[in-house]
Amino acid sequence: MANYYEVLGVQVQRFPEDIKKAYRKLALKWHPDKNPDNKEEAERRFKQVAEAYEVLSDAKKRDVYDRYGEAGAEGSCAVGRPFEDPFEYIFSFRDPAEVFREFFGGQDPFSFDFFGNPLENILGSRRNSRGSRSRGSAPLFSTFSEFPAFGGGFSSFDTGFSSFGSLGSGGLSSFWMSYGSDGTGSFKSMSTSTEIVDGKKITTKRIIENGQERVEVEEDGEFSLKSFIINSKEQLLRIDTK
């Protein structure tokens, strides 16, 4: 069994925030979806990083590991005797993918639907044939080399920004998104898109923070009508700008 502190690259007397930051960086670096050409090694490292995080991020498990090391992680003390309360002390590791999703607030940064297109759900039947937009079958994040924000700086995942121009004749005039983490495991992403529908300028903002989704739609940029969707529940709010 590898030394969990060495796996995360942290010292023994580090703060919980340092452990979370180390996990975030290494989990993103070794995620199997990001390493298709080295998947076997990536899966091994990804699993190892998840196990190290599960132990060192939990105060009780970390205390047992600090005192008994590998024997503690396997549920036996230094002299080879089992702990009196195996349920409390034996480390049961979860699926590393589950640890990864939980860390990022239930969202998967490697999934296209993580950012999605809120206009598809909000506008629906309001969009005519000219206003509809076709998209290719390949996911947006299928190849990280084609997505600058997820390129060389993706391993730190501290901040990011990407912008796109028109994506075709569908009327989408602009799209940008930003994302980041504060180092404590919380995650926030925001995307903004502008589209012309029936001659009207529709601007949509979508914010996902720690698993909570908020969508805001503005019509013609006059702030006279806003449609909010919070966790798939739509709410209408009219604001008097006079």
Swiss-Prot record:
Residues 1-69 form the J domain. GO terms for biological process: chaperone-mediated protein folding. SMART domains: DnaJ. Testis specific. SUPFAM superfamilies: Chaperone J-domain. PROSITE patterns: DNAJ_1 (PS00636), DNAJ_2 (PS50076). InterPro entries: DnaJ_domain, DnaJ_domain_CS, DNJB2/6-like, J_dom_sf. Keywords: Chaperone. GO terms for molecular function: Hsp70 protein binding; unfolded protein binding. The keyword Chaperone applies. Disulfide bonds: none annotated. May operate as a co-chaperone of the male germ cell- and haploid stage-specific Hsp70 proteins. This is DnaJ homolog subfamily B member 3. It comes from Macaca fuscata fuscata. The lineage of its organism: Eukaryota, Metazoa, Chordata, Craniata, Vertebrata.
